[in-house]
Amino acid sequence: LLAKALCLAMHLLGLHKEMDDMDTCIRWFQRFIWIGIAMNMVFAIPALFAPGLLTSVVGLPPQLSDPWLENAGMLLVGISVFYMPSGFNAPRYVVHSWLCVLTRLIAVVFWIYLINTSIQGSVFVPMLMGDLSFFLILGILLYLGTTPQNRPWALLCDGWREWRAAWKRQWQSHGFKVGTLVVLAVLGFIGYETWYQMLRVVPEQEYASDEDHYKYAAIGLGIEARIPYYLFAVLPQMCPEKMPKPGGWEVFGFLYENGKDLPIGMAKRQIGYPTVEPNCALCHTGSYRASASDVAVNVPSAPANTLQLQAFQWYAYDCASDPKFTTDAVMAAINSKFQLGFFEKLYNRYLIIPMAKSALLKQKQAYAWQKLRPQQGPGRTDTFNPTKMVVFGFPDDSTIGTVDLPQVWNQKPRESMYLHWDGNNNKIHERNYAAAMAVGATPESVLPPSFNRVTNWLLGHKAPAWPWALDQAKVAQGKPIWEANCAACHDFGRADTGQVTTHIDQLGTDPHRLDSFTTGLVAAFHTFKKPPFDFGAYRKTQSYSNTPTDGVWLRAPYLHNGSVPTLWDLLQPPEKRPVVFITGSDVYDPVNVGFVTTGAQAKASADFNYDTRLEGNHNTGHLYGTQLSDDDKRALIEFMKTL
């Protein structure tokens, strides 16, 4: 039927007279081979020499420009060279010609796989249609242009008979038998070692307590989002001049517990080789202490107020880009710290470390947009621009989505509330899976049992109580002030809590985060349905949500972008709020309720200057309570310590 359809098409094109003999089919086969080569080169040359331009012209996601396009370009050049003998003389190289047809079929299968597994699957549909068309045209022309004995089934049967006969002759030789067994043994050993070093799935560590599981268990990120464990251990010493100050990962605000080799929020996972990956606790475990000389108290599910996530990312990216970041240098550092076996060293040297470097360089390009925005600083991240540009492949729209990292405790009463700062979703599982996807989880990699255990623990895990003494008289004075000025929007059980009720023009807070979550992103979420990921509850809003305030004392700095350092500052008119202040300290200010931002204590424990004059950092709006007297403000703050 396909052959008849092609003949009909040729007839309609006025070429039916040329279809009278097989030579004509072969000539057209060779012409289409050269057409295919030309089309390959039209794609391959810019892919090799101008990948960024190609992505913008074709509409591919920008993160595919490197190294994906360069690799694709080299592959297409190789395939084009492979096609050339058939383009010159297909009858002479008939088996080779059928292999050319087969490559198109392999490409069709590859595109179908990408379309069904990749988040950007739709962009590969034109490639699928192109290769499918060439497969059908080339296959039909070659079939019509060859004799029956040169068609696939006959060639396969002849080849099988010849192979069996040759095998029987060779098998008579004792040396051939020994050589065959040696080759099979070597191949088997290489295959086993490759499986053992690269693919073997080691069961995840079981944690007795839900809290330890939250802090140290993997949730299932994709391979490019995981860092080889040995590399993670030595990376701080690879480029010490690029570190903010001497030390290990703690200089980026990572929190450690005694006896643990990994910081809280970094999970060890082994698929072949050991890796580490971030989990929920990295961004949602905070700390506090009374003075810079005290030992910090770690609080799982609190905002990670000291974590400098962007600085950590770019240290890894810039270090991987450094000329001295070579496999030899990395392996020397690893060997000085760990005792690896012979084959473990071999696979790390020639596969694992080069793969990790390639992944870091790819991420560096994918996250280059971060350099065009104000620095995030401690305790903050851009929530949805990574999803927009890195996951879904949207072009950079210059929006700023930087927010203060939120707490994640006490999720049960929040299950149906519209949260994510702008109230864009009221489904806890969707919110959690979307956060995981933004840092590298995929439908194939995510571990639902581990994820569900974390989610279930957070449902009932309560906010920490105020750890210091309270002035009960002030608490009593502050309660009615809270009821009159704050409770309607921020108390559990109220109709407006967890809802978007006040337009951004009236609320007056910085609109950049709101603008960064677009209707296009909502549409992308709604169409992305690959179990267990399903994001049908996302919506676009026109302001920020009224969030519950349990544990508000440990959620400083305040407002969605962390632009107001303390509750006392939040109750001041915007013109009296600090313009520039230090963030990243976990030394607590129990009077003003927040972390210290000035003075020796702040400078001893942090060094990032938050500038509210920068776009996305504005400290305007939320004027509620600013009209109160200072005495009433102090009473209100004392009561809010009890929430």
Question: Positions of the model-derived regions?
Answer:
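Membrane-helix boundary connector in multi-pass membrane proteins
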Residues: 109-126
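Hydrophobic alpha-helical membrane segments
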Residues: 97-111
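Core segments of alpha-helical transmembrane spans in multipass integral membrane proteins
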Residues: 38-46, 64-88, 101-105
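Membrane-helix boundary elements
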Residues: 26-33, 39-67
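Juxtamembrane helix-break-helix junctions at the cytosolic face
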Residues: 83-95, 115
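Periplasmic c-type cytochrome electron-transfer domains
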Residues: 173-643
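Membrane-water interface at the C-terminal end of transmembrane alpha helices
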Residues: 132-154
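Membrane-interfacial, low-structure loops and terminal tails that flank and connect transmembrane helices
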Residues: 151-172
